[in-house]
Amino acid sequence: MSLQMLRSRVALARPTLVRPSVGQMTKRFAGTAPVPLTWERFLLLRTRRRQINFVASIFTGVATSVLAWGFISEAELDLEQQDVFFGLDAFTAAGLGVVAAGFMGSLLGPTIGQLIFKATNSKQWPAFLMKETDFLSHIQKNRVNPRYQSVSNPVPDYYGEKIGSLKDYRRWLRDCAKYNRAREV
């Protein structure tokens, strides 16, 4: 067997990736290329995610309260005024149960909100996560030491939660520098 035939048999035995020419790729995939995520767009998406999480918290809190109220009202419990639950009368205990269910439901809201946000922005999700990691490292690097806070010198937004635009980020950096200058005096 010749060396060329041996090479071709080895090449056929291994799976290879077939790459189309660059011209065909750009024609074929020109409309599906993801748009790079700018800082302005990232901060807008971050604000939108916070809004979605807030609305989802309200919705799940109300929904679990309604479900708890439905369960308590439909349950075949013999609730009389003389019944005592945890030292409280039955109606007070039922009301506190509905409030507790609403509170637990509102804690579930951000998880559902995150799923909704991820589903609506699935194309930009990987770029969003990378930008968020980069953004949080910037915040961690530039944040101030809260040990030196006082009533006249409060800590400026320690976690950067109020940053919604590049203008807000620059203002946050100026506030951090102002805090550090006031600390040194």
UniProtKB/Swiss-Prot annotation:
Membrane-related topology note: Multi-pass membrane protein
Q: Which GO BP terms, alphabetically?
A: protein import into mitochondrial matrix
One Pfam family from the UniProt entry?
Answer: Pam17
The record's keywords, sorted A to Z, are: Membrane, Mitochondrion, Mitochondrion inner membrane, Protein transport, Transit peptide, Translocation, Transmembrane, Transmembrane helix, Transport
Q: Where is the transit peptide?
A: 1-29
Q: Which GO terms describe its cellular component?
A: PAM complex, Tim23 associated import motor
Query: Which parts of the chain span the membrane according to its record?
Result: 52-72, 84-104
Quote the subunit structure annotation: Component of the PAM complex, at least composed of mtHsp70 (SSC1), MGE1, TIM44, PAM16, PAM17 and PAM18.
- What's the protein here called? Presequence translocated-associated motor subunit PAM17, mitochondrial
This protein's species is Yarrowia lipolytica (strain CLIB 122 / E 150)
Q: What is the lineage of its organism?
A: Eukaryota, Fungi, Dikarya, Ascomycota, Saccharomycotina
